[in-house]
Amino acid sequence: MAESQIQSYTINFGPQHPAAHGVLRLILEMSGEVVDRADPHVGLLHRGTEKLIEHKTYLQATPYFDRLDYVGTMNQEHAFVLATEKLLGIDIPIRAKFIRTLYDEIGRILNHLLNVTAFIFDVGGMTPLLYGFEEREKLMEFYERVCGARLHANYYRPGGVAADLPAGLLEDIAAWCETFPKVLDDIETLATDNRIFKQRVVDIGVVSPEQALDWGFTGPNLRASGIAWDLRKSQPYDVYDQMEFDIPVGKNGDGYDRYLVRVLEMRESVKIMKQCIAKMPGGPVRVEDNKITPPKRSEMKTSMESLIHHFKLFTEGFKVPAGEVYGAIEAPKGEFAVYLVSDGTGKPYRCKIRPPGYVHLQALDMMSKGHMLADVVANIGSIDIVFGEIDR
């Protein structure tokens, strides 16, 4: 009897595949069920964000950052307003720094909750996804109460934040911080020691520390490979230098470690949120310079100068001194950065966005070689990609 030949063929994975997490199109070259090459095709969600920003004032450019990684939105705004503030040479009030730090961590939990539970869902576990969405709903309510929007917040502004926290909000966030670890315990009970889950993700998509650095990994994907690099510790911004927290680090660099690092990061985020609430100082939430931030409504009703400031701010925007600056933050997915070039006018000359997901997606081929087709799905879930920021 003639021995059967393993047939090599090419298949399209996505862009409308439920496990593709958006509009990912993968061209998979297969030998039987084994992947020889995974070629990601990006650009299906390209909206020309960087070019649009060049035609907008700095204030009008901020909302575009919500639409990049649309899972935890305020973190992206943070990188842009930090870069703008560096160019302006201003220091924002301490209360605004605490509010930003608090909402950065809420964004981190929003992101990890979706990723961890969707990752478990990708490999066959449905229940955690329902738990995760219930908690995300509560967090989005905190977004809504502070700025009126559940997702596209546009809350951080150059010079501080858009508005102060409403009465009673901090108490409600503190109450949520007490109940949330129990939900994490429930998710971990279902997944962490689950035999089926571990068989799907342990030793799948292993990335060594050297490979992680060579490919430019950042964030949880880098830490899962055993490198304790976190911008909140190494280059602290706002009030992270006043916060006590640990950096969870994996040791195998596989899908399971990436999952564990994110779960532990959520626990650390709750710690940071509690400290922000406990230490939250009083005072203003925006710089008092009306050349940069709008005057109070009450002043505009009585003062002609305030009205002029307001009109100038929202028609031509504030002028930013010429120069270039790189502003980076530790976003939930990794190092999100903005390279901002100003030519001294009210609009950015160039705004290069450095998304973490773009780098991680490049490594998908390296991670999936020699694995089965079903493991590609597990790899996509474990590196946490969102196409808003990859395609921009």
Curated annotation (Swiss-Prot):
Keywords for the protein's UniProt record, in alphabetical order: Cell inner membrane, Cell membrane, Membrane, NAD, Quinone, Translocase, Transport, Ubiquinone
Record keyword NAD present: yes
Membrane topology of the entry: Peripheral membrane protein
Catalytic activity: a quinone + NADH + 5 H(+)(in) = a quinol + NAD(+) + 4 H(+)(out)
UniProt subcellular location: Cell inner membrane
Pfam families: Complex1_49kDa
Primary enzyme class: translocase
Entry EC no(s): 7.1.1.-
One GO CC term on file: plasma membrane
Family as reported in the entry's similarity comment: Belongs to the complex I 49 kDa subunit family.
Family annotation (HAMAP family): NDH1_NuoD
NCBIfam families, sorted: NuoD, PRK06075.1
Record protein name field: NADH-quinone oxidoreductase subunit D
Species name: Paramagnetospirillum magneticum (strain ATCC 700264 / AMB-1) (Magnetospirillum magneticum)
The encoding gene: nuoD
